[in-house]
């Protein structure tokens, strides 16, 4: 998958940005706060997903007021496609999307255009809480299994309804009928989510473990385990091998066993919303015992594995967005990144191009005050 044309106007501080990207390597230069990350974020919006920076959609609108528009053409494995996103400012901003000139919802974009990002915030994959890793697993799974995001949304809605019943603190006999309605939905949805996570963690471990060994130059080993609050630790080994009806029954039994304690707590204490991806370095939890360098290497290995898995399973590469991270890596780690993404289209932002191992070919774009300045130049290493 390659972006062949991009036009951005009114996205935060970006004004009239129009470029023809290189099919391989694109270096986005500029001082801090000039719009480099905003440009990557504008590309990311074309996936239909929430911002990788956690930005609210209304905050995409230009700082000075007005409307925004992001337009792109891209080539996938079959054909060239186009996508256009417009947002009109107002008390409630109005967003419109067209894919190949046909009006669409944001959710439709996810199955059309795919990116993999690596940003400084991705260190939270290792240092953050379980929710961050669950979100990562669900997004990665959805890139290969399109219904996944819908499953997660429906699960969350059913969970909210079950928790609303629990918060009423009704006697168990009175609450049982209401809870049974939501338990039935949660056991079906939760099982499907857990199975997809288990399948993905198995694939992730197969790719991430050797990648980390490359990045760490064999100094230590990493291990990944899918911990399910219903199906136990190492669920990536057991879930894909079991029949779905048996798993649904097991999930339902867990829900009914915890009903009394859930009523006392006022919330649902077990289920897919309590799962985690356990990350260990030399057998010890990476979050507690890993050094900053080890955590950064592990986060990098996870994101590179995501890109490699997507490429192998989908038979085409995602667009890769590297936001202000390459300059922080030593030459050995940069070389690993370059090897993994060499067949992919990459956008790299930096303030310090001299710190990068840049390929001989590619394009360089200079951003200042939200606008492209000067001519686009080849050979990014000459900056």
Regions inferred by a protein language model and the residue ranges of each:
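Long, charged N-terminal accessory/stalk domains
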Residues: 124-125, 131-180, 184-187
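Walker B catalytic acidic pair
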Residues: 323-325
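Post-Walker A helix-loop "phosphate-sensing" segment adjacent to the P-loop in P-loop NTPases
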Residues: 45-57, 305-313
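Conserved NTPase motor "head" modules and their coupling/switch loops across ABC/AAA+ ATPases, GTPases
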Residues: 1-31, 173-319, 328-339, 345, ...
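Conserved lysine of the Walker
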Residues: 36
